[in-house]
Amino acid sequence: MASEDPSVSGVSGRYATALFELARDEKVIDAVKADLDKFSAMLVESPELLRLVRSPVFGAEAQTKALGAVLDKAGIAGISANFLKLLAANRRLFVVADVIGAYRALVARFKGEATADVTVAETLSDKNLEALKLALKSVTGKDVTLNINVDPAIIGGLVVKLGSRMVDSSIRTKLNSIKHAMKEAG
């Protein structure tokens, strides 16, 4: 299963696949995804937690103990908590973001959905988000979940990555193309 999707490979893919298969067998795929999404948001919001996850200074025992306290406080329990503690015990907590991404990809594939990473210059309105979802659904034939990243550096337009395909209609890219064309011409 892991070899079918490039986003589900390596160490993180193996861990995500094992978690997905366990969650599927226990019929808790969505609950585990919700827990992982909550943990992912916690990583973004807490520099201390991110340091705990990434730093090689903390030993496996210290990471596991600290992580257990964080998970208890966050209300993350069961398979999700045990899995995250296993990553800490095995000194693999630093790949947790990749594991979460791979797990999301496995869930999407299982549900017949696709996930698109969309980079925009400014936040899209709900109307524009729905229009983009419908446009991508017409291309893929699948329900599409959007991961929106706001990057003002693209100036305008958007960059869409869907599986191995990428469409870059950003103003930054268009300006760079014009710049290169002018250099070659002049």
Swiss-Prot record:
Keyword Cell membrane assigned:
yes
Tell where it localizes: Cell inner membrane
What superkingdom does the record give?
A: Bacteria
Instruction: Please report the record's description of how this protein sits within the membrane.
Output: Peripheral membrane protein
Gene Ontology MF terms: proton-transporting ATP synthase activity, rotational mechanism
PROSITE patterns from the xrefs? Answer: ATPASE_DELTA
The protein's UniProt keywords, in alphabetical order, are:
ATP synthesis, Cell inner membrane, Cell membrane, CF(1), Hydrogen ion transport, Ion transport, Membrane, Transport
Q: Main site of residence?
A: membrane
Q: Which Pfam families match?
A: OSCP
An example Gene Ontology CC term for this record: plasma membrane
Q: Where are the transmembrane segments?
A: none
Role, per record: F(1)F(0) ATP synthase produces ATP from ADP in the presence of a proton or sodium gradient. F-type ATPases consist of two structural domains, F(1) containing the extramembraneous catalytic core and F(0) containing the membrane proton channel, linked together by a central stalk and a peripheral stalk. During catalysis, ATP synthesis in the catalytic domain of F(1) is coupled via a rotary mechanism of the central stalk subunits to proton translocation.
Q: Which family does it belong to?
A: Belongs to the ATPase delta chain family.
PANTHER family under this entry? ATP SYNTHASE DELTA CHAIN
Q: How does it assemble?
A: F-type ATPases have 2 components, F(1) - the catalytic core - and F(0) - the membrane proton channel. F(1) has five subunits: alpha(3), beta(3), gamma(1), delta(1), epsilon(1). CF(0) has four main subunits: a(1), b(1), b'(1) and c(10-14). The alpha and beta chains form an alternating ring which encloses part of the gamma chain. F(1) is attached to F(0) by a central stalk formed by the gamma and epsilon chains, while a peripheral stalk is formed by the delta, b and b' chains.
Name the chain's protein: ATP synthase subunit delta
Provide the gene name from the record. Answer: atpH
